[in-house]
Structure formats: C-alpha cells, structure tokens
C-alpha cells in the first residue's frame, strides 16, 4: 500500500484481522497493521454478524482496528426465507444495549491510539499478546480461558483485553 495515496479520512472496512490459518505458521505477526496504523482507519468484520463476537473484539483490540456493526431497523425474522440470512444478527433492537456497552468501553480505553503509529507487537505467551503504540500505551489481549499475567505484572482477565497507559 502506498501511504502517499491514502487520505486520513479513508476507512478500510471488513478487514480480515486473523489472516492465514496455515498449520505451518506458528504465530501471526500484524505486518499490515504495523505499516498502516495511524495513517488509515480500518475495521474487522461487523461484530454482530461474525461467527464469534468475542474473538473479533479481541482481534480488533490486538490489531488496533476500529469496531464495526451492521444494523437494520426491521426484525431479523423479516429475513427468513430470503437470500440475506447472513444479516440475521443485524436486528438493531436486539443488539442496542450490548453494542453501546462494547463500543463505549472500547472507545474510552483505546480511542487515543487510533491516530498513533503501532510500534511493536509481541507474544507474551502463546495466548497473551501485547501491542505497543508510539506514546507507550500497551494493549494486552488474552485469548485464554484463564486469567494471565504479563511480565510487568499486568493481570489480564480471561478472554479480555487491558490497556496500560
């Protein structure tokens, strides 16, 4: 990607945050995100339409992605017997409260990193990652079903993220 051609108002939506799942790859390294973070806004899949909302949220926190949701006004039952069943989770009234809770926390804790360069990414353990931003902010993401502790003493609850400023 040529950053000279990218405007700051550009947003890349529905980015595959997980990348390849080849069995010969031990760890995923976010080369793409390291290169563009702070220059271009990007999101993963819409949280309410993905097969695993929690994984997509954790991937977004690890890779510095914004959050995306796709909603419709009508009930999801309107989609039965149509070709649009992939939007079955787009019922706004069903997601409103959870969406506000997820978005508010994410924006309050990570909003200050959106225009910063991502300067580092490391695996603390096989299930605990740390993404580092130019102001020194660290974002720990725990994919484990157990609470984990980072080398600096930061405790990260199971299947959650912690931002250290």
Segment roles from a protein language model:
Residues 2, 6-9, 13-165:
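Active-site-proximal substrate-binding groove within the catalytic cores of carbohydrate-active enzymes
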